[in-house]
Amino acid sequence: MKAVILLSGGLDSSTILYQAKADGCECYSISFDYQQRHRRELHSAFLVAQTAGIVQHQVINFDLRLWGGSALTDDNIDLPQERSLDAMSQNIPVTYVPARNTIFLSFALAYAEAIAAQRVYIGVNALDYSGYPDCRPDYIEAMQEVFRLGTKQGREGQPINIVAPLINLKKTEIIQLGNQLGVPWNLTWSCYAGGDVACGVCDSCRLRLAAFAELGLEDPLPYAYLKGV
């Protein structure tokens, strides 16, 4: 069974790649260079894909800085730092990129139909503190209907299925799953800041560090700055 994997190089997407392999899929990964602040993640995506031994890794290029609207695509919007986990859960954060997962899933759908894949794996996580609207179960259900209605395969009764194995998992549970699957955490990248070393203070770094700490595990990545989460 062929599967397209949305791979950012982060903790979640790397876990779903290894899950797809464990599910017996022939894996094709797709990453996106949308001129994001943290383009460093693309290097990690390549390394994770290479280590996993997938069939093909694609990088799609487009520029979401053309209209911005997010701290990840507009340098005039400050990146949140040193926020508590409770503070992260209050509102949809400025790191939300408008319609990003819809854009990503559209590319993944086209890729999947072109190679006659049966699945698209995405690492969305509704229980995380991000609050992103395009990481929630109702969104995935709606996009599944788009997959069914908007493709030849779907209209012929063989829709491409969206697989979101992390949707109801906590970050700690994702790490535990990744450990079981053999995910190389040292190759992954979560930081939003855009440096060569993970900052340790952006929301993404703090979520990751807090999860490793809760499990009593050491995150193998070096960090520029560490403070209790």
Curated annotation (Swiss-Prot):
Query: Per the UniProt entry, what are the Gene Ontology biological process annotations, in alphabetical order?
Result: queuosine biosynthetic process
EC number(s) on file: 6.3.4.20
UniProt keywords (A-Z) are: ATP-binding, Ligase, Metal-binding, Nucleotide-binding, Queuosine biosynthesis, Zinc
Residues that coordinate or bind ATP? 7-17
Q: How is the cofactor bound?
A: Binds 1 zinc ion per subunit.
GO molecular-function terms, A-Z: ATP binding; ligase activity, forming carbon-nitrogen bonds; zinc ion binding
| Residues engaged in binding Zn(2+) | 191, 199, 202, 205
- Name its co-factor(s): Zn(2+)
- Known catalysed reaction(s)? 7-carboxy-7-deazaguanine + NH4(+) + ATP = 7-cyano-7-deazaguanine + ADP + phosphate + H2O + H(+)
Q: In which pathway does it act?
A: Purine metabolism; 7-cyano-7-deazaguanine biosynthesis
CDD domains recorded for this chain? QueC-like (cd01995)
Pfam families per record = QueC
Identify the InterPro entries for this entry: QueC, Rossmann-like_a/b/a_fold
Family, per entry: Belongs to the QueC family.
**Function per UniProt:** Catalyzes the ATP-dependent conversion of 7-carboxy-7-deazaguanine (CDG) to 7-cyano-7-deazaguanine (preQ(0)).
The UniProt entry, under PANTHER family, shows: 7-CYANO-7-DEAZAGUANINE SYNTHASE
Q: What is this protein called?
A: 7-cyano-7-deazaguanine synthase
Native species of this protein?
Answer: Nostoc sp. (strain PCC 7120 / SAG 25.82 / UTEX 2576)
**Classification of source organism:** Bacteria, Bacillati, Cyanobacteriota, Cyanophyceae, Nostocales
